[in-house]
């Protein structure tokens, strides 16, 4: 799923830009 983060998600930060984009991260 995706959760709001308040900052841009990057793969290096363990996030999924492909699925979530701005202000969202995989959990």
Curated annotation (Swiss-Prot):
Primary residence: secreted
Disulfide bonds: 2-16, 9-20, 15-26
Tissue-specific expression: Confined to the epidermis and to the mucus layer.
Disulfide bond as UniProt keyword: yes
Domain of life, source organism: Eukaryota
Cellular localization per UniProt: Secreted
Molecular function GO labels: sodium channel regulator activity; toxin activity
Hydrophobic/aromatic residue important for potent activity (site feature) positions: 8
Cellular component, GO, one term: extracellular region
Alphabetically ordered keywords of this record: Disulfide bond, Hydroxylation, Ion channel impairing toxin, Knottin, Neurotoxin, Secreted, Toxin, Voltage-gated sodium channel impairing toxin
Primary role: Highly potent toxin against both insect and some mammalian sodium channels (Nav). It potently inhibits inactivation of insect sodium channels of B.germanica (BgNav1) and also delays the inactivation of mammalian Nav with potent activity on Nav1.3/SCN3A and Nav1.4/SCN4A. 1 uM is enough to completely inhibits the inactivation, resulting in sustained non-inactivating currents. In addition, the toxin significantly enhances the recovery from inactivation, and the open state is not required for the toxin to interact with the channel.
Remarks, miscellaneous: Negative results: does not show effect on rat Nav1.8/SCN10A.
Stated family: Belongs to the nemertide family.
Domain remark from Swiss-Prot or TrEMBL: The presence of a 'disulfide through disulfide knot' structurally defines this protein as a knottin.
Full protein name: Nemertide alpha-8
Organism of origin: Riseriellus occultus (Ribbon worm)
